[in-house]
Amino acid sequence: MRWPIFIALAVILFVLGNMAYYGGWFGGGPQTSAPAPTDGGPPPSSPGEPVADGGAEQLPDEPVPVEPQEPVDTPAPDVPEPVTFDHHPAGDLIAKSGSGYLDRTVWSPQMCFPFEEAAFANSQVYGPGGGMGPADKPSQCDPSNYSLPWRDNFCESRGYSSPLCANGKGHQGQDIRPATCKKDIHWVVAAEDGVITDIGTYTVTLTGSAAPHRVYRYLHMRMTQLAVAEGAVVQAGDRLGKASNDFGGTPTTIHMHFELRAGVAGTSTDGKAVMVHTFLPPYLSLVAAYDRKRAGGVCQ
């Protein structure tokens, strides 16, 4: 009876020994899991496991995030070109035609442009076809007279009294040619609300209703076809007449001479401050008015 007992004990010891060995009870057998760390750090990676990159672990059922796309450059909105046109600076007269007045004041800032259509400010005397114009360009209809840039001719050499000009004499206004070299076609209009205070042999005078009561004088319209009479009340933009070449008994070139007068502060010969009602350079007021016209502005 001892042999069976002995064999049974041997089998039990054999099984327990294997369990102890493979289970690592005594530190000698293989381990199926990493031992717990003893220094508080993370457990070492088991062979075959991916090395962590320090980021959050992606779970299998989570959607794969879309890679960020390059930012799309949104084009900047178009900036409109400033509304202007080609013109010489104020006071820049044709060479040898006189000394221009270099004033930068817009004396009539809300003035209505005095033509219904496009027009060209330049010199009718020193330009082609004028009495002092270039000999090689004898025609007043020369294309250069009807193209940009504009040119100032206030204070151009003349014998007329004009206190702001050198020696107190010079051209009293600005010459403006109509859209084409044709007379009695293109309408001239009122520069502001006012009254027609005088009609002369070849002049029409408009006095503004509002202070400072500027005075505008128009020359060389077709005087037999005027749209207004002396004493008429007009609004800015109202038709006055058509550009022509009336100049008494001697016709001039086809153009409209435009003057601006108003009271300005001055000093008398004995040093006293006075108000002087005199001719003022209209060029920059015309430039500003033409800019508004080209931009679609209406006379008010």
Which positions does each model-derived feature cover?
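Ser/Thr-rich, Pro/Gly/Ala-heavy low-complexity intrinsically disordered linkers and tails
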Residues: 28-74
